[in-house]
Amino acid sequence: MLMPKRVKYRREHRGRMKGRAKGGTEVHFGEYGLQALEPAWITNRQIEAARRAMTRYMRRGGKVWIKIFPSKPYTAKPLEVRMGSGKGAPEGWVAVVKPGKVMFEIAGVSEEVAREALRLASHKLPIKCKFVKREEIGGESNES
């Protein structure tokens, strides 16, 4: 499971997810990618479930890149605890994903296999996603 080795602070503010992703909106490493269409927190368990779904479908072929990392801790208070008395204990880790971010990339397989693998991965995530090719994003090719 993905998580930071060490962090400066155990608890973080929730923050806001306004606007579109600044970077990571194009397919750089692989040939095909899975692009987020909505803002969300993606947990390390969801990332791992999506990775397993992709690699199981592709069997031995292809390479997968995970372009998001769960670096933000989220906290939760125990059940039936009254309000107040401090912030809850760290519960897990999330990656903040904004619309336009390419979360996963695949190379070394045919387009049909990549499309199906990324479709299976998208069902493990709590947001709407889009299949993108390397040359499609932005309307022109990436070679220039």
UniProtKB/Swiss-Prot annotation:
InterPro entries: Ribosomal_uL16 (IPR047873), Ribosomal_uL16_bact-type (IPR000114), Ribosomal_uL16_CS (IPR020798), Ribosomal_uL16_dom (IPR016180), Ribosomal_uL16_sf (IPR036920)
Superkingdom of source: Bacteria
GO molecular function, one term: tRNA binding
Single Gene Ontology BP annotation: translation
Keyword Signal in record: no
Entries under Pfam families matching the protein: Ribosomal_L16 (PF00252)
Keywords: Ribonucleoprotein, Ribosomal protein, RNA-binding, rRNA-binding, tRNA-binding
This protein's GO CC annotations: cytosolic large ribosomal subunit
Subunit: Part of the 50S ribosomal subunit.
NCBIfam families (UniProt xref): rplP_bact (TIGR01164)
Function in brief: Binds 23S rRNA and is also seen to make contacts with the A and possibly P site tRNAs.
Family: Belongs to the universal ribosomal protein uL16 family.
Entry protein name: Large ribosomal subunit protein uL16
Organism per entry: Anoxybacillus flavithermus (strain DSM 21510 / WK1)
Phylogenetic placement of the source organism: Bacteria, Bacillati, Bacillota, Bacilli, Bacillales
